[in-house]
Amino acid sequence: MDWETLKADCLACSRCELCKTRTNVVFGQGVPDAEVLFVGEGPGQSEDEQGLPFVGRSGQLLDKYLFAIDLDREKNCYIANIVKCRPPQNRDPLPAESEACMPWLREQFRLLRPKIVVCLGRIAAQRMIRSDFSVTKEHGQFMEKNGILFMGPSTRPPCCAARRTSPMPLPTLWLCGTRSTKCVSIPMNESSSPSAHFVRIHLPRRGEVLAA
């Protein structure tokens, strides 16, 4: 299946009850040969209205992070979600909804063949890395699966950070660049400057925690 066929089929999806309440299917956004894949939980209100992932305040925050490490959803990365339709009232996707939607993400994964997968939030990490993944115990760690580096959320997804009205001085977000050789620590604070110091590193070993 190619990208065009996959997207057309996904936009017509009726595999779960979310199809009855959605405005738009949020298929994903990015380049078809991206080495870095970001996976979120699911669309929010703004995403449901526009049909694109991470376009509200959380999207603006995420774009700051991407810009700081030379990533751009229009040029060299891809953004998708576990579920393609917005759960009502932005609740967590039900297990049945996630399971019904995962084949779409698996096909995107197969077409992309990314080198690095960054999970944006607990639910994404538990679906992509391991069902018992613990953000508290395993945040910011790289884990290798079948030659692909998976990274769990370092603190919380951008949608949570964007809703904060007070600064978040301590938590940081680790993202890895497209060449797999540079990482940057960016404050999880929407008011912070996106410019940050780049740190050259080697590929992390299995389970290695990257620290400043």
Where are the language model's segments positioned?
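A polyanion-binding, active-site-adjacent surface
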Residues: M1-F198, A212
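Glycine-biased, low-complexity coil/linker segments
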Residues: R206-G207
